[in-house]
UniProtKB/Swiss-Prot annotation:
Protein name, entry field: Nascent polypeptide-associated complex subunit beta-2
One Pfam family linked to the record: NAC
General function of this protein: Acts as a component of the nascent polypeptide-associated complex (NAC), which promotes mitochondrial protein import by enhancing productive ribosome interactions with the outer mitochondrial membrane. Also blocks the inappropriate interaction of ribosomes translating non-secretory nascent polypeptides with translocation sites in the membrane of the endoplasmic reticulum. BTT1 may act as a transcription factor that exert a negative effect on the expression of several genes that are transcribed by RNA polymerase II.
Lineage, broadest ranks: Eukaryota, Fungi, Dikarya, Ascomycota, Saccharomycotina
Domain of life: Eukaryota
CDD domains according to UniProt: NAC_BTF3
UniProt record similarity statement: Belongs to the NAC-beta family.
Any GO CC annotation of this UniProt entry: cytoplasm
Gene Ontology BP term (one): protein transport
SMART domains given in the database record: NAC
Ranges of residues in domain NAC-A/B: 38-103
Keywords, in A-Z order: Cytoplasm, Nucleus, Protein transport, Repressor, Transcription, Transcription regulation, Transport
The protein's assembly and partners: Part of the nascent polypeptide-associated complex (NAC), consisting of EGD2 and either EGD1 or BTT1. NAC associates with ribosomes via EGD1 or BTT1.
Major localization class: cytoplasm
């Protein structure tokens, strides 16, 4: 059966004007530009609420002493404890400081055992720093000897 080209062109014009349906491309959805962890935070708060923690009032500051000599310092921290689970929670924004920076303000609040521990920790850090300095000096000396050879 022969096809009439004129009728075919006329049908193409009519079909182009009356397009049915849309384009087949996917619409790009924009994700959350500000990724808050509110969803995770609410789940965590819900789980912690199940432990029935007790809030300790009037805590001015809290400090975590790390073994590398850094201290996590919390100003105006909210402290909660759940003794049945042996759990202590500290809520707040920590600032990471050095042990030397916080030592004068913290020393008056500590007992004798804690002071001995902190002085020992500071002494160990100083010893480690001197050992690292000696090793770096030796490395630089050997590099110079290799370069001169």
């Amino acid at each position: 059966m022969p096809v009439d080209q004129e009728k075919l062109a006329k049908l193409h014009k009519l079909s182009a004007a009356n397009k049915v349906g849309g384009t087949r491309r996917k619409i790009n959805k924009k994700g959350n530009l500000y990724n808050n962890n509110d969803k995770d935070n609410t789940k965590l708060q819900a789980e912690l609420h199940k432990l029935h923690p007790m809030t300790i009032e009037n805590v001015a500051e809290a400090n975590f002493f790390k073994k590398n000599g850094k201290v996590l310092h919390f100003n105006s921290a909210v402290v909660q404890i759940a003794p049945q689970c042996n759990l202590t929670m500290i809520h707040g924004q920590p600032k990471e400081n050095t042990l030397n920076g916080l030592y004068p303000s913290v020393a008056s609040q500590l007992g004798s055992q804690e002071l001995e521990y902190l002085t020992g920790l500071a002494h160990n850090l100083e010893n480690e720093q001197t050992v690292l300095d000696q090793l770096s000096d030796r490395c630089s000396e050997t590099k110079q000897q290799v370069m001169n050879s």
